[in-house]
Amino acid sequence: MSVELVDYDEAVAEFDPVLGLEVHVELNTATKMFSGSPTEFGAEPNTQVDPTSLGLPGAMPVLNAKALESAIRIGLALNCSIAERCRFARKNYFYPDMPKNFQTSQYDEPIAFDGYLDVDVPASEDGTKPAFTYRVLIERAHMEEDTGKSLHVGGSTGRIHGAEFSLVDYNRAGIPLIEIVTRPLEGTGDRAPDVARAYVAALRDVLRSLDVSDVKMEQGSLRCDVNLSLRPTPQSPLGTRSETKNVNSLRSVERAVRYEVSRHAAVLRSGAKVVQETRHWHEDTGLTTSGREKSDAEDYRYFPEPDLVPIVPDRAWVEELRAALPEPPAQRRKRLHAEWGFSDLEFRDLVNAGAIDLVEATVAAGASPAAARKWWSGELARRANADGVELSALAVGPADVAELAALVEAGKLTDRLAREALEGVLAGEGSVAEVVEARGLVVVQDDGALVAAVEKVLAANPDVVEKIRGGKAQAAGALIGQVMKEMRGKADAARIRELVLERVG
C-alpha cells in the first residue's frame, strides 16, 4: 500500500519512535571462522573458498581462536558479561548465498550479553538542540559466519526480483562476524536519527581502537540493520517494527531512521497496520522498499551445532583480556582534547584517518600536537592515499616525524625542505639526519650569503623596489620568491623578508 509520507517533525510530535540497531562486524582475522581460507577483501570471485565454507559433505568446522578472542574483547569493551559457557547453533534457511542451507551462529547462548555504551550525541547544526549523552543498552554480541555475496544481473532494482540471472561469490562465506544487538532505544524522541548515527559512530570508534576490524562501511565490513517502530506515547506497548537491512554509512543510518519514522506515521495515520518486514535501503533515492515479511526466530528452526563443542572461556584469560583493553575512545578524546586543545572535529578526522595513535606517539617523541597533527593528517595522509595503504604502513614512524618537526621548529629546515627530506626517508635513503646530510637540505644560516642573494635580486628589479618604497609592502613577496630560488629553497623566508625590507629602506 502506498501512502503519502508524513513530515518528520509532525510524525515525532504525534508518535514516539523506538529504535533497535543490529550491527554486523567483519573481524580482521587472517582466516575464516571455521576453516583456513584467507579473508582478503577484493580477491577474484570464488578464489577464497574451501570444503567447509562451501558446505561439501564430510567437511568439519574448527573454531578460529583469534575470532573468539576478538569477540570476547568486543564484549568487554562494551561492558558486557562474558558467558561462562556458550555454544553455536544452526540457523536454517535456504538461499543461494549460504551453500550449507544453514548459517552457523549463536542463538540462545551468545558469547557476550547485558552491556552498554555511553554515546555522546552532538548538538544540532543550527544549535537549537543541545548535546547530550545517551546510554545504549546492549542485549547481546554473538559470533556467526558471514554469507556469500549475490550479484543480481538485469532488472531495474539490483534485487533478485526481476533479475535475468544471479551470480554468487562465496569468498565472503564463512568470514567471522560479530553481531551486536541493542535493546530498544527508548526516549530518543525527535533526536532518534541523531542517536542512531552517534551510536554507530561511537561503536565504530570502539572497534577501531580494539583493532578487531577495519570497520569500512563502504566495503561491508561494518553493516547496520535499523529496526524501528512507533507508538502513541512512551507509556504505550511497542509497535510493530520494520527492519531496514544493510545500511552502509553513518549518514544513511540517520536518513533511514528519518524516512522510516515518516513512513510508519503515514501508515498509522491512514488507519492501516504496519507490516513486520525487512526493507531495502536505497542510497540514491533515500527511500526504503519492501523486501520480505520478517521471520521470527522459530521460523529458522535453530538447533545446537553438533559439529562444534561448547565454548567455556577460561576466566583468568578473560580477565587478562580485560586488563589489556585500550583506553575507551570517548575517554581518550576528552583527555587529548584537554591536553592538546583539538576540537572534536579535528580529533574525529584523526581517528577516521587511523592517525590518532601515530599522532600521540609523535607527541611523545617530542613534537608539538599541532605539528604532529599537521604532518600525519597532511603530507603523510596524502602519500598514504596516493599509495593506497594505511598510514601505519608507510616507511616512516613517529620518531622520524618528530625529528622533522624539530628541525623545522629550530629553523634548520623549511617546510619545503622538510617535505623533501620526508620523500627521501620514504624512498629508503636512510634516516632523517642521513637524508638531510646526503641531499644537503639544511637551511643556509650565513647572512652573508643571504645578503648577496638579496642584493642581486634587488638590483635586477628596480621597479619592484620603487613599489615597495611607495608603500606597497606586499610587492616584496615577488622578491622573496626570487631570493628563495637563488638559494635553491635553502633559506628562511621570514629572514629573507627582513633583509629585503631593510635594504629597500
From Swiss-Prot:
Top-level taxon: Bacteria
**Keywords associated with the record:** ATP-binding, Ligase, Nucleotide-binding, Protein biosynthesis
Q: Does the keyword Nucleotide-binding apply?
A: yes
What is the E.C. number? 6.3.5.-
> Keyword ATP-binding on this protein?
yes
The protein's enzyme class = ligase
MF GO annotations = asparaginyl-tRNA synthase (glutamine-hydrolyzing) activity; ATP binding; glutaminyl-tRNA synthase (glutamine-hydrolyzing) activity
The chemistry this enzyme catalyses reads: L-glutamyl-tRNA(Gln) + L-glutamine + ATP + H2O = L-glutaminyl-tRNA(Gln) + L-glutamate + ADP + phosphate + H(+); L-aspartyl-tRNA(Asn) + L-glutamine + ATP + H2O = L-asparaginyl-tRNA(Asn) + L-glutamate + ADP + phosphate + 2 H(+)
Which PANTHER family does the entry mention? GLUTAMYL-TRNA GLN AMIDOTRANSFERASE SUBUNIT B MITOCHONDRIAL AND PROKARYOTIC PET112-RELATED, GLUTAMYL-TRNA(GLN) AMIDOTRANSFERASE SUBUNIT B, MITOCHONDRIAL
Q: How does it assemble?
A: Heterotrimer of A, B and C subunits.
What the protein does comes down to:
Allows the formation of correctly charged Asn-tRNA(Asn) or Gln-tRNA(Gln) through the transamidation of misacylated Asp-tRNA(Asn) or Glu-tRNA(Gln) in organisms which lack either or both of asparaginyl-tRNA or glutaminyl-tRNA synthetases. The reaction takes place in the presence of glutamine and ATP through an activated phospho-Asp-tRNA(Asn) or phospho-Glu-tRNA(Gln).
Q: Which family does it belong to?
A: Belongs to the GatB/GatE family. GatB subfamily.
Protein's name according to its UniProt entry: Aspartyl/glutamyl-tRNA(Asn/Gln) amidotransferase subunit B
Q: Which gene encodes it?
A: gatB
